[in-house]
Amino acid sequence: MRRGIAAAVLATAIAVSASACGSSGSSASGSAASAGPVTITWWDTSDATNEAPTYKALVAQFERANPNIKVNYVSVPFADAQTKFTTAAAAGKGAPDVLRSDVGWVAGFAQQGYLVPLDGTPAAAEKASFEQQLITQATYQGKLYGIPEVTDTLALMYNKAIFAKAGITAAPTTWDQLKADAAQIKQKAGVDGFDFNPNSYYAMPFLYGEGTDMIDVANKKLEFNSAAAIKGINTLKDLISAPGVAKLDTTANGYANIMDAFESGKVASIIQGPWETTNVFKGSSFTDKSNLGIAAVPAGSAGKAGAPIGGHNLVAYAGSDAAHQAASEKLIAFLTSAASQTTIATKNATLPTRQDAYTSAVTANPGIAGFQAVLSAGMPRPANAQYSSLYGPFGTELTKILTGQESVQAGMSNVTVQSQKLLPDYAAQ
């Protein structure tokens, strides 16, 4: 939906004095509406079993501190949330006041007029305390539409004991070093040195390593066909066919198979995110947590390592009335405070988005401490509403490239053609 249509829906909703929030029916007019008790709805997309209990406890704490605000907490499956929110916001009915949004959704929601800017509100009062690349990622056309709640990135996870057995004392810092280490590990330790998940998100470090991305926003260009992108994917293709690198697994269970192999010591290193550290520590090779090494992804020929930044932002719905927006801003500020983020990190083993939340209690978790050290290599996503949609065509062609069904040049050309349908105003290289 275009911004103008969204605005029309919002105007209609206000005209009939009905809150667009599904949890309440308060009008935006009148002092009583702003002074009296208000109930806001929060859609939480965290894991309902392992993470939601922490958020429910924080909501209860918030309500005790703010007796005039009640929070209708709703756990919404992450896989359904983007479509569900879009449908409700487009209809002007049933959308929550606050949403835990994937960082990749924010630009699209903002472009469609579904979110309210948070600049100058209580939600953004401590903006300077957050990792600035995360603030950049939550900004669209110069306005801040989300407050970073949790973050993540990719890193090289490696088995220190296997590396030591092969006579390797440090993690590789370039793809060429990783290739050489994999061969040495296979020869001296008898297991594969590296395994790769053939997913476009996991291929991004190979683009960043050549100083490029999927798009160039400033010049409105698609980068898939650029010399740098071609070089990056050629580097990846050469790596996965090198001695000591596990055979590419493109089956439906491929992701799980890679993790099982790493956790059991059958593979020495993988590219992975912090969401898997809890599972890794349950593996037979990591009963001693200090055996897990976490390093920045290797660098490409540009000499710089780079990995995509993921995570979630808290956003506020533009269709909520003034009283509900004010209450939403308070909730967002509370949930993203240093104290709340410390609680979330210690309970859920997720990465905080602000440095003052990395307390000694938080960094006592070696997974969090390890990923904190590599966050500086994180690359914020460009502020383009269609950016996340590009992972689809990129992933489809990447599988064909890596399995030898098409050349790197042909595959990246195909990605370009498909991407131009999503970004018709972007030129190809």
State where each predicted segment sits:
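Extracytoplasmic/periplasmic substrate-recognition and gating elements
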Residues: 60, 166, 238-244, 283-347
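A structural signal for short loop-to-beta-strand junctions that line the ligand-binding cleft
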Residues: 95-97, 126-162, 192-196, 294, ...
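Hinge/lid segment of periplasmic solute-binding proteins
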Residues: 103-153, 177-179, 187, 206, ...
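Glycine-centered hinge/linker elements that transmit conformational signals in sensory
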Residues: 182-183, 221-250
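Short, solvent-exposed loop/beta-turn-alpha elements that line the ligand-binding surface or hinge
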Residues: 119-130, 212-233, 282-287, 296-306, ...
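Extracytoplasmic "Venus flytrap"/periplasmic binding protein-like
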Residues: 61-130, 164-166, 173, 265-269, ...
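Conserved N-terminal structural module of periplasmic/extracytoplasmic solute-binding proteins
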Residues: 2-107, 299-302, 323-326, 410, ...
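Long, aromatic- and glycine/proline-rich binding clefts that accommodate carbohydrate-like moieties
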Residues: 133-136, 292-296, 345-393, 400, ...
